[in-house]
């Protein structure tokens, strides 16, 4: 509805968690790959720089203002590209106020601790 935009609640929560479940990590990655995204409710493919981790964090900063948010990662997207697991962790840490890992069981069962540590170091958390 036209009034939907008037009912935000960002000021009422301590921290917002978003799912930055993108395999394009930087704006450069997104522009190079020219990725299209199909969400569950889309009738056609979508494009926009917010469909990468860096772009999503920039857009959320714009929307949320001074309110904190953490970027979430979807670990199983990176089974075949462990380097990008480290990159997405680092990018989320650098550009947001925290990191949400979905789901820790993937890190445990696939022994991805080295990649997590590397991402946290590159992100400035270790």
Regions found by a protein language model. Give the residues of each.
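Distinct, well-ordered alpha-helical segments
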Residues: 2-9
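Substrate-binding cleft of secreted/luminal carbohydrate-active enzymes
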Residues: 12-32, 36-126
């Amino acid at each position: 509805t036209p009034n939907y935009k008037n009912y935000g609640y960002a000021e009422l929560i301590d921290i917002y968690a978003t799912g930055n479940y993108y395999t394009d990590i930087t704006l450069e990655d997104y522009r190079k790959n020219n990725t299209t995204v199909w969400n569950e409710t889309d009738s056609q493919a979508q494009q926009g720089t917010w469909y990468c981790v860096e772009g999503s964090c920039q857009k959320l900063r714009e929307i949320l203002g001074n309110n904190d948010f953490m970027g979430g990662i979807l670990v199983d997207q990176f089974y075949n590209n462990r380097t990008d697991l480290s990159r997405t962790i680092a990018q989320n840490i650098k550009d947001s106020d925290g990191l949400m890992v979905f789901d820790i069981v993937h890190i445990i069962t696939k022994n991805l601790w080295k990649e997590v540590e590397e991402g946290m170091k590159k992100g400035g958390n270790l």
